[in-house]
Every structure is written in structure tokens, then in C-alpha cells.
């Protein structure tokens, strides 16, 4: 079994460390992180992601963090929202939550000896540049409705 120095590994990037300078510095200190993945969860609970090599992400980080990436929506389950003829879906990163690293312990990075990692960024799905869709929106709305209903009951 391969053993790794767990103290040298990156596990999360907290929400308060998402400036471009901080991200660049953190990823620069962790060359074992080879990919950045913007991950959205559809209403069926399936994750849809776009995996970007770190070098490409760093070159155009502002664009990726602001506008995300576009997918054709073919693998996204959005019943009664997206159809094959209008399935354009943008995956927009959420800078208000912690990001985490998914390590592949089967593939050590030859330079660091640490497992190759993918920075996974929770993201929203936006259909046709108009509305946020997917499980993150359902959860957000459920929390808001619960709070509103509870406050109404307490009044």
C-alpha cells in the first residue's frame, strides 16, 4: 500500500480564501492538484461537472469564476425545464461555500509523491442565461420557505 504524508495534502479552500490571488497562491503551493472541476447537481441528484486543467483555469481564472463554463445540457436532468432543443446550461461556481479536493490515491504525482487531486467547486446550474436550476436552488428555496413559514407561525 502506498502511504502519503497527509499533513502536506490540501483538503479544502475555505470560502474566505476565494480571491484570485489567494487561489493562485494555494494552487501554486500544491502542484499535485492537476484539475479544477465545476460541479452542479441536477434535480435528479446527478452531478454534472466540467473538468479543467489547472493551467487553463489559472490562465483565465476571472472568466471561470464569474461566468463558469457552458455545457450542452445533455447529461443534466431538468424535467419540464430543459429540452434537447434548448438545453444550454451554464455551470457557475459558488464562491460563498468551501471548495474541496478529491484525491485519487491510485495515482501519485511524480513530483510531489502526493495523490493527484481535483479541486471540486460546488456550482449552480443556469438554464439559458435566465434562471438558476438544480438541487442547490431547490434546497435554497426550501430553506427560505421553511424560515418564512416558521416565522409566520411564531407571529
Feature annotation, model-predicted:
Residues 1-155:
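ATP/Mg2+-dependent ligation/transfer catalytic cores
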Amino acid at each position: 500500500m502506498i502511504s502519503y504524508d497527509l499533513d502536506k495534502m490540501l483538503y479544502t479552500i475555505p470560502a474566505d480564501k476565494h480571491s484570485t490571488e489567494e487561489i493562485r497562491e494555494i494552487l501554486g503551493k500544491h502542484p499535485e492538484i492537476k484539475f479544477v472541476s465545476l460541479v452542479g447537481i441536477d434535480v435528479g441528484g446527478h452531478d454534472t461537472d466540467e473538468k479543467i486543467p489547472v493551467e487553463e483555469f489559472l490562465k483565465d481564472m476571472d472568466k471561470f469564476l464569474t461566468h463558469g463554463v457552458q455545457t450542452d445540457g445533455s447529461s443534466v436532468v431538468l424535467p419540464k425545464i430543459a429540452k434537447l432543443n434548448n438545453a444550454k446550461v451554464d455551470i457557475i461556481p459558488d464562491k460563498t461555500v468551501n471548495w474541496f479536493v478529491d484525491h485519487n490515491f491510485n495515482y501519485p504525482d511524480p513530483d510531489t509523491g502526493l495523490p493527484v487531486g481535483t479541486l471540486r467547486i460546488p456550482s449552480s446550474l443556469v438554464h439559458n442565461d435566465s434562471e438558476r436550476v438544480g438541487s442547490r436552488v431547490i434546497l435554497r428555496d426550501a430553506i427560505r420557505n421553511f424560515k418564512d413559514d416558521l416565522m409566520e407561525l411564531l407571529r
